[in-house]
Amino acid sequence: MWATLAKKIFGTANDRRLKGYRPKVAAINALEPEIQKLSDEELAAQTITLRAQLAEGKTLDDLIVPAFATVREAARRVLGQRHFDVQLIGGMVLHEGGIAEMRTGEGKTLVATLATYLNALAGQGVHVVTVNDYLARRDAEWMGQVYRFLGLSTGIIVHGLDDAQRREAYAADITYGTNNEFGFDYLRDNMKYELSHMVQRGHAFAIVDEVDSILIDEARTPLIISGPSDDKSDLYNLVDTLIPKLNDEDFELDEKQRSTNLTEAGNEHIEELLREIGALHDGSLYDAVNVTLVHHVNQALRAHKLFQRDKDYIERNGEIVIIDEFTGRMMPGRRYSEGLHQALEAKEHVQVQPENVTLASITFQNYFRLYKKLAGMTGTAATEADEFAEIYRLEVVSIPTNNPVRRHDEDDEVYRSGEEKLRAITREIEAAGQTLQPMLVGTTSIEKSEQLAAFMLQQGYKQIDFSEPKALQKLYAAARSGKPSKLFAVLNARFHEQEAYIVAEAGVPGAITIATNMAGRGTDIKLGGNVDMRVEQECASLPPGPDRDAKEAEIRAEVDSFRDQAIAAGGLYIIGTERHESRRIDNQLRGRSGRQGDPGRSKFFLSLKDDLMRIFGSDRMESMLLKLGLKEDEAIVHPWINKALEKAQQKVEARNFEMRKNILKYDNVMNDQRKVVFEQRREMMGQDSLEEMIHDMRTGVVDDLVGKFVPHDAYPEAWDIEGLTQGLETALNLALPLADWAKEEGITDEAMHERLQQAAETAYAERAERNGPDLMRYIEKQVVLQVLDHLWREHLVTLDHLRQVIGWRGLAQRDPLNEYKSEAFALFDELITQLRETTTAQLSRVEVAFAPSADQSPFETLAAAAPFDPVPAVPPLAASLALEGPTETGQTAVSFMPQQGVEAFNGRDVLVAAEPTIPTLERNADDPKSWGRVGRNEPCPCGSGKKYKHCHGMIS
């Protein structure tokens, strides 16, 4: 009570924040008449004036008033749109690095121009991030008119651009693109071998559109660049045949936690089935040698019991395509990791693609935290304000609407079963259709949308076929006649090509649009229809002239008439068929109605069998409703139901927040190491010579060898001369008379150390002289970078495996996170040691084995042949330096191995890239000392067929 009273007297924190912006809004308005007097040339020259003021020492904050006034006037002249006062406030929130929560239809795209222009004046580049290529192109072309008028350059980053085009786009003052493209470019840049090949120029300021979708919904999705690994499709298909044979008592299913596990009986049953097909020979399923089988069984079990076709994924053209649980959109190119996607392919009997090995990865959480300043816009952020503040340090400011919201949100109706709910929804659609009220019916999955569509077809409705050229003419004709059309459109992942068109016409009187979740987000539903899209569709075949002008005028008049009809019918009616786990998604659905002061209404129809009610609702809810005498086809409507559902949603949101926080804690460990590796890489690429670093590495290797085989202050008789001889051969390619040295009178460990160091330096200097010092400097840099990349990839795999099993440490009363940090640090320390040893060993064997052309030096020939870029621009191929086995002279020759090009990148989550050729030494299967460092997941060099970690790796 006191909190409510205090809010009435003092206002909320949001109200006080808004009040602080009012003086600057007033100053911008006061400057407007003066700005309006400027000619187009004088207005455009404001950019030069403002940049000059920055150079003289003014800050961006000092320039808010003139900059915003300039953009407002430019938008009025170029677009015919003038920023409202509330939009000016939104621009200030973005400039300060906050999140502007603005309702649908309030002009977020236009608001972004204010902060974008102001920050672009600094010349460090501004990134405007959208959720898909369509919106990136649309916004760049639309708002780009304003920026170009003011003398700023714009670029766009979408799929299909080569590196030169990307570099040009990033060099622009303002760059539009999708979150995935920005993230993947960052990863690809950190796999380049020359600074000049990189495309991004830094991370100064980013404005993220639909910030909740990208930073909350996508937070758990890592961006992964990967390369193919071994083909195990037969094993996936084999294990897949066993899962349907399991009984209900063989596994436990937890829908809340999205997990499934075999019971003790299930373990025995699956072991029996595996033995029958010859996949399990000796011992238990959980013996170390069978760890791969356990992994395949677990993923197959998840694929069959947790993932549903047409809800979590669809089968399209022989491929499994993931469906975004929040938007209902397909995500082509994105694949589940850790073999789950392969298990789904086996389940649906399509070709099982090879698993991928991670080359580089980063989460959106960590990518967007690279920016010095980050801002965002969305229609719904208040429910996640705590998460934005805690994870990203972003404050959410709710911007008031320019016109009051006139949408009426009604209480939910709850029915006993799904069939009763469908009948109630159809009755509601029938009733609203009598007045030609446009309706948007939101569902949570493709399966649910098609279930409702099938039910409506049974009731005599007809589905609009958008493959027909004049698909909507019947709907327009019905609107003209004032009679219900009984036509409906379906928008889900199957019809995503027509998404913008279907959504644009959802505001036509009498239109019924069934959509999955937030499909079509980013496209406004305008009452009466979208006049521009309709003109484009219906006038496309008409040449410019009187006939086209007349047709366009006719369409515009009809759309205005339809708008009046839709308003008279009550505006857009949002019908929700199920509550989502997140209140934010429900609010987004409701927010499609009542844009810019239009009327509207919304209501959710629920059943006790809905997922949220069944999994997260109170166990007593169903029994209580039945005691109240709830009969068939009878609904209960009560504010208590809404509160109970909201509590269930809050529980789910809190759980998801904790999961994201926990993931971030673990990811931060890898992120800290990633920063070190990427910064070190960039520093090495920027140096002309790594001679000093290579010298330090060589010195470190000698120190390690002496420390291992020549104990300090020990007599020569105690030295391990045989071990030292082998160590020098492996690590430094040196054959020295160590036994004779050890017999010398008065020889000490310090003297031995000094001789070894001198011998290593002399041998390397001679090699550099033979190859040419300039060429050797070039080779040194490429070898160090390639070895670092190879070790980093293996390190990522090892960390991933560690993360999967570290949770079991909790059973021993040890904190898994601290254990993970400790072991990850030890592994990283080992990586540094291996980098030193492997680089030194490789460079000690380098010998150039080709003749340069007559007019080129060896360095020029090598540089021209091998750009050393493991992720080249598509489509050219790159050549990669490889170190072959010893030649007849006992040296290792440099050759040029053509490298596979990067496969066309269609996707969001995983880029399948060719794996760079890694310098390797010739290995003798019978001599483990010749193997060098073997990756834990590589086949054991002994030829057993097992992974190294399950063979000689266990011994070592």
UniProtKB/Swiss-Prot annotation:
Enzyme Commission designation? 7.4.2.8
One annotated GO biological process = protein targeting
Keyword match Cytoplasm: yes
Which leading EC class covers this enzyme? translocase
Question: Subunit comment for this entry?
Answer: Monomer and homodimer. Part of the essential Sec protein translocation apparatus which comprises SecA, SecYEG and auxiliary proteins SecDF-YajC and YidC.
- One Pfam family of this protein, by short name? SEC-C
Q: What does the entry list as the binding residues for Zn(2+)?
A: 940, 942, 951-952
Protein name stated in the entry: Protein translocase subunit SecA
